[in-house]
C-alpha cells in the first residue's frame, strides 16, 4: 500500500509512475482518493470544533449546579453535540472504508532504477553465468527424461488429481528431497538465514498483507467455509509472521528461509508451459524473506539475489540475471530481478527465481514497523523476498542440462552426499 501522504504531496508524479506500468491502471482513482481524503480531513476539523465546544459546555455544568441553576438546556446541547459528532464518525468510517478499498488496489511505484519497457522482451540482462549447455546428441525434454527413467509420472497424477500435477518416484523423489535439504542447509549455514517451517494455509488478512488479495483472488486456491487460502508462496506466512508488530531496530535485518509447498491456479496461463514441471498447480519452493531498515534495503536485495545465485552456481546450471522492466514488474515490487536457468528443450532461459524489494508497500498493508530505540517513533520496515530457489524447475533444469546420450542423468556433485553417494540416475 502506498503512503497516502505521498499521494497527497506528489499526485502528478504518482500518476505518471502508474501510467508507466504495464498493467492497465485507471489513474483517475488517485483523484478519487484525494477527494475522499480532503472530505475526511474537513470532517475531522469539524469534529474537533464540536468536541472542543462540547468540552467547554460540559465544564460549565458543575459550576452551574453548584450555584443551583438549571442545567437542562446545557445537557440538551451536550446531547445534540454528541449526536452530531456520532453522525460525523459514521460518515468518517464510510469514507475510510472507501479509501482503504481503493488504496489496496493501487500497485507499487517502480524504483527509478527500473528500466522502461512494456513486456518481458524489454527486461535487461545484467549478468550471466556459464554458457548454455551444448550436446553432441539430440537432447530430450525433462518430461520425457523423467518418464523414461520412471522418476516422474504425469499420466497417473492426471488420473489421481488432474492436469499440472506430478508424482515424483524413486530417485526423482529423492532428488526433490535432496534439493530442499541442500537449499535449506546452504541458506542457513552459509548465508545466515533462520529456518522457518510455515503453515500452508493462511487467512484473508495475511493474503491482503503481502498483496495477493484483493487483486489476485482468482489465482488462489480457497477453502471457502473457513475463508482460508492455500499459500501461493512461503512469502505470505513468513512476511505476516510480524504483522501488527513493532520490531527492534538492532534486530534488523531479519533473514528467514522457508521451505513450503506452493499452490497456484495459474488462471491466466492457459496454453503456456502445459507439459512438464515448469508450471504446476502444486510445487515445492525454498523462499528467502528479509525485513530491513529503509536505508539498507537495496544493499540487502543485492545480497539476497547473490544468495539465490550461489545455489545455481554450485549446481552448475547455466543462468542469467535480468532486471525487470516497468511493464513486467508486477503489482507489489518496487524493483525486481529474475534469475533464469537455461532449458535446452525450450532453447531459452526460464525463470527460476524472482528477487524483489517491496520497500514499505507490504509493511504498510501488514502494519510491520520498527523502532530504533524505546523513545523513537515507529517506522515501516522494508520487506524483500526471493526464491532460493523453486524446486521443481531446478529438477527440470538438472534433468535437461545433465542428461547423457544413453538416457541417464548425471547428479550434480554438490547433491551427491544428499543422494546417498550416487553419481547418476539410470
UniProtKB/Swiss-Prot annotation:
SUPFAM superfamilies: Class II aaRS and biotin synthetases (SSF55681), tRNA-binding arm (SSF46589). InterPro entries: aa-tRNA-synt_IIb, aa-tRNA-synth_II, aa-tRNA-synth_II/BPL/LPL, Ser-tRNA-ligase_type_1, Ser-tRNA-synth_1_N, SerRS_1_N_sf, SerRS_core, tRNA-bd_arm. It catalyses: tRNA(Ser) + L-serine + ATP = L-seryl-tRNA(Ser) + AMP + diphosphate + H(+); tRNA(Sec) + L-serine + ATP = L-seryl-tRNA(Sec) + AMP + diphosphate + H(+). Gene3D superfamilies: Bira Bifunctional Protein, Domain 2, Serine-tRNA synthetase, tRNA binding domain. GO terms for molecular function: ATP binding; catalytic activity, acting on a protein; serine-tRNA ligase activity; transferase activity. Pathway: Aminoacyl-tRNA biosynthesis; selenocysteinyl-tRNA(Sec) biosynthesis; L-seryl-tRNA(Sec) from L-serine and tRNA(Sec): step 1/1. Consists of two distinct domains, a catalytic core and a N-terminal extension that is involved in tRNA binding. This is Serine--tRNA ligase. The gene is serS.
